[in-house]
C-alpha cells in the first residue's frame, strides 16, 4: 500500500508541476553527460563531474519538468517522465559504479589504469567480483555489495591486443 501511495504522489507531482521544460530535453541532456563522461574510456575527473552534473540535472528535472495531459488515461508524456526519472537515477549510479571500479577490464578503459604500452590494466586481486548496488533512496547513498567471482576453468591474465 505504501508503494502505491509513493507512485501516485510521484505521478501527481509530475502533472501538477507546472514546469516549462519538456521531458525530452532532460533525456537528451542526460544522454550527453553519459556519452561524454561514462563511455568506454573514462577517468576519475570526468566520472566525478558526471555524478555532480546528473545530480543537478535530476534536481532541475523535478523542479522544471513539464508533463502535459491528465493523471488518468492515456498519457505518453507522463510515462516518459517516469522513465526519464528512473534513467537519471540509473545514470548517476552507473557513474558511481564506474568510479568505484578502479581498473580497466572488458569493454571499459579507465585512463588512470593502463600499462606502459597503453593497454587496459586489470586489477584482478581487487576487482574479481560482481557489483550489486542496494537502493537506499538517493543514488549517492546506494550501498555496494560484492559477489566474488570464482573461475574454475580459465586463468585470469592481462590481455594484449598488439
Residue ranges and their predicted role:
Residues 1-162:
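Glycine- and aromatic-enriched mobile tails/lids
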Amino acid at each position: 500500500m505504501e508503494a502505491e501511495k509513493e507512485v501516485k504522489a510521484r505521478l501527481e507531482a509530475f502533472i501538477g508541476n507546472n514546469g516549462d521544460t519538456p521531458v525530452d530535453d532532460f533525456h537528451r541532456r542526460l544522454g550527453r553527460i553519459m556519452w561524454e563522461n561514462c563511455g568506454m574510456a573514462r577517468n576519475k575527473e570526468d566520472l566525478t563531474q558526471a555524478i555532480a552534473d546528473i545530480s543537478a540535472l535530476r534536481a532541475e528535472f523535478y523542479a522544471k519538468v513539464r508533463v502535459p495531459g491528465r493523471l488518468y488515461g492515456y498519457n505518453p508524456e507522463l510515462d516518459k517522465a517516469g522513465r526519464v526519472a528512473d534513467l537519471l537515477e540509473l545514470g548517476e549510479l552507473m557513474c558511481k559504479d564506474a568510479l568505484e571500479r578502479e581498473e580497466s577490464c572488458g569493454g571499459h578503459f579507465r585512463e588512470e589504469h593502463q600499462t606502459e604500452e597503453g593497454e587496459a590494466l586489470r586489477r584482478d586481486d581487487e576487482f574479481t567480483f560482481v557489483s550489486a548496488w542496494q537502493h537506499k533512496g538517493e543514488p549517492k547513498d546506494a550501498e555496494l555489495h560484492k559477489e566474488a567471482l570464482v573461475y574454475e576453468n580459465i586463468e585470469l591474465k592481462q590481455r594484449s591486443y598488439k
